[in-house]
Amino acid sequence: MQKRHTDRESYFGEQSQTSKNYYIPYIKEVIGHIPDKVLEVGCGEGGNLLPFAEAGCRVMGVDIDATRIEQARTFFAQRHQQGQFIATDIFQLKDKATNFPLILLHDVIEHIRDKERFLSGLQKHLSADGAIFVGFPAWQMPFGGHQQIAHSRIVSHFPFLHL
């Protein structure tokens, strides 16, 4: 596993910068503004959500990994930011999160087995005029198989291994 994947606070910062420098400007261009509420599915430590919170958005992150959710709460508290983070399977979220004008899926969709059920289920969390932002690694890219998070030092630095 590469260092950037074991140092979760650094990874949080990396995600935050990517979101601030690329996602928010792109979303502003496409939607015309920054939505007031944002839901991220598969949020991990919440790094993608931090710039939205700093911009005054109400943010909610959902992740199946309870450890990541605790880290998100800690990282947000350290930065004096508000965010709601829930450790649950997205299929179990039910009506806890509704009416979001923006749902983020960053490097998540490739991990969902039942994509049709997943995507159709997101509608109940989306506002009538809402948008879903989907980012994913291209399979044909050097690290499209996520081998960079492998525990083997050799495998984690070996591009195209998944092909």
Per-range role (PLM):
Residues 66, 112-113:
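A structural helix-start
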Residues 50-53, 119-123:
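A structural alpha-helix within SAM-dependent methyltransferase catalytic domains
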Residues 1-98, 102:
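Conserved N-terminal segment of class I S-adenosyl-L-methionine
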Residues 102-108:
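A short beta-strand submotif of the Rossmann-like class I SAM-dependent methyltransferase core
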Residues 113-121, 131-163:
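S-adenosyl-L-methionine-dependent methyltransferase catalytic module, highlighting the catalytic core
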Residues 92, 110, 141:
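Active-site micro-motifs of SAM-dependent methyltransferase domains
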